[in-house]
Amino acid sequence: MNDVAELKEFAVTHARAQNIAGYRDVLARVDNDEDGAEGSWAIEWTRAGAALEERGKHLEAAQCYNMGRFPFVDGPARSDALRRCVAAFDRWRGPGIERIAVDGGQVRGWAAGLSAAKPRPLLLITGGIVSIKEQWAPILSAVTRLGMAGVVTEMPGVGENSLPYTPDSWRMLSTVLDAVAGRADVSRTYALALSFSGHLAMRCALDDPRIRAVVTAGAPVRGFFTDRAWLRTVPRLTMDTLAHLTRTGRDDVAGQLDKWALTDEQLRALEIPVYYMKSARDEIIPPAEAELVRSRVREAHLLEHDDTHGSPGHITETRLWSVWAVLHARRALPAQRLALGAALRLLRARPPRR
């Protein structure tokens, strides 16, 4: 059972990222996190999703169901919310988005723009430890407009991914590339990997030259995994989620994380550009992680927001910067890059949303 106040605090970033209308009304109705109870987190969000689904608003329903299973499935109510989320997204998606299954179905994803006749460069999209593929898959139509194929998948243990999260989980990304190699030009893969999946993408790029760039936001690098004093300040929800994903006891997870840390040698060995968005007041990721990237990675591009984890007050700016970063790494669509750069400068001149 999660702390309701902490759930509500974390929910704001994800609700804003999905443009969920009326999310504050749903949060106001939540007063507990007991599985299946009236007024509980999963029940209230599932009820909101069902009401939208009855009106034929399948994407909006999927977004509410996604919030209902947040941060991870820990009982029947959240399991039902996840099942409904995937089903609602499946009903919403058009013919241009297809379902994929990898590694015997242990890894699942949504894809667009795959073609054996005309394989395109691939944008591989992954969320962090609490965000599922259905949260990010709606952007696939925009990916194809950039002249790329896109695959959205999940970190191990997240959503429908049944793998455990281990120090070797980066290999999963290579497995996904292998699975679509016949229908995408995976030799030109660009990873848009948020938060903890950014760490996976950087580690994978050391061994898999098909990854040509990593665009990330608030990714752990070393300090998060090794600094016990910092870990004691990390929100309980984050540590509980990591314990769930790693299949480790809550009291033992901190002692296991040092195996994930990237060394100076590994960071210096990265021969690809890394685009890293830092939140200056991040309550999860230590501030020194961005400095490690800047000082060790050969080609590092940093963007900093005066904000908390995920920069909920800078969502539009982060989205534009992420698209710009992918195009910059590809050296593609120069006119669009210039337009994005101009839009970013205008946004950065405005006060942040609080």
Where are these regions (language model features)?
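Catalytic histidine neighborhood in serine/cysteine hydrolases
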Residues: 295-312
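Conserved alpha/beta-hydrolase
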Residues: 143-160
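Hydrolase active-site cap/lid region
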Residues: 203-255, 272
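Short alpha-helix in the alpha/beta-hydrolase fold that links the catalytic acid
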Residues: 272, 286-295, 306
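Alpha/beta-hydrolase active-site loop
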Residues: 135, 163-184, 190, 203
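Short beta-strand/loop motif that positions the catalytic acidic residue
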Residues: 269-271, 276-278
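N-terminal cap/lid segment of alpha/beta-hydrolase-fold proteins
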Residues: 45, 72-116
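Catalytic histidine-centered segment of alpha/beta-hydrolase-like enzymes
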Residues: 72, 307-319, 337-341
